[in-house]
């Protein structure tokens, strides 16, 4: 068995005296592990840092085996991101989110979103908002997507300012007003489908805080609490730095 794909480094662990088990997020083969012989050498270590993108060739005798990687550098982001505390926590949080995906389950859209996020993680003006969007996309990839397109009560697609914590669906201002204390805020930038580079406007800090409150609620309900986990420290630190709370 053999394939070649690009891969974002999201984790590694020691294996034997000189090797590592490398974990990549790839567009065509999903989250995939493989052994890198000599991965702990001085030559290989800088390449195998989380946040870097590699060209990987995976080989194994059987499809279900761990297999081995041969890797070449494509985009080495780690050295650039090391100078930013926000970026370092962002890489750690992004990697942890991607590790929630089932192994070998392709998610090409999430891979592309992760690459966009990595490219901007050291930009405090837009990285936090991009992370909120990525968390929403990850929830959808795990089967817990939110419906923010129209009001759950009226079907209208305007004046959407709340989200129901029970259904994960948007609620309009008029329909939600009597229950506002029980609803989650829907910040404007999550209703805006524009993307960076095409008229996308940077949301303000309060909007980003509300975005993290929204995604954090559903991540807690569907991901962390069922696993008996608290909010990961890397997320808490990224949110604090990204919203001016540290």
Curated annotation (Swiss-Prot):
InterPro entries: ARFGAP/RecO (IPR037278), DNA_rep/recomb_RecO_N (IPR022572), NA-bd_OB-fold (IPR012340), RecO (IPR003717), RecO_C (IPR042242). Involved in DNA repair and RecF pathway recombination. It comes from Methylorubrum extorquens (strain CM4 / NCIMB 13688). GO terms for cellular component: bacterial nucleoid. It holds the Pfam family RecO_C. Keywords: DNA damage, DNA recombination, DNA repair. Belongs to the RecO family. HAMAP family: RecO. NCBIfam families: reco. This is DNA repair protein RecO. One of its GO terms (biological process) is double-strand break repair. It comes from the Bacteria.
């Amino acid at each position: 068995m053999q394939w070649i794909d690009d891969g974002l480094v999201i984790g590694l662990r020691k294996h034997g005296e000189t090797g590592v088990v490398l974990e990549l997020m790839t567009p065509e083969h999903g989250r995939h592990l493989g052994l890198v012989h000599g991965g702990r050498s001085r030559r290989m270590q800088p390449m195998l840092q989380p946040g870097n993108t590699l060209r990987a060739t995976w080989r194994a005798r059987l499809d279900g085996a761990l297999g081995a990687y041969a890797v070449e550098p494509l985009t080495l982001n780690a050295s650039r991101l090391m100078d930013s505390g926000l970026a370092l926590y962002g890489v750690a949080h992004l990697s942890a989110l991607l590790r929630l995906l089932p192994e070998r389950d392709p998610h090409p859209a999430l891979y592309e979103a992760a690459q966009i996020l990595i490219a901007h993680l050291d930009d405090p003006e837009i990285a936090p908002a991009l992370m909120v969007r990525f968390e929403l996309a990850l929830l959808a990839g795990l089967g817990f997507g939110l419906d923010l397109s129209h009001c759950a009560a009226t079907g209208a697609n305007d004046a959407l300012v709340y989200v129901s914590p029970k259904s994960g669906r948007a609620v309009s201002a008029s329909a939600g007003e009597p229950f506002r204390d029980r609803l989650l805020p829907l910040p404007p930038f999550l209703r805006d489908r524009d993307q960076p580079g095409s008229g996308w406007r940077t949301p303000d800090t309060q909007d980003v805080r509300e975005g993290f409150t929204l995604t954090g609620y559903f991540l807690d309900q569907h991901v962390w609490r069922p696993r008996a986990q608290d909010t990961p420290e890397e997320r808490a630190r990224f949110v604090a730095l990204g919203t001016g709370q540290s």
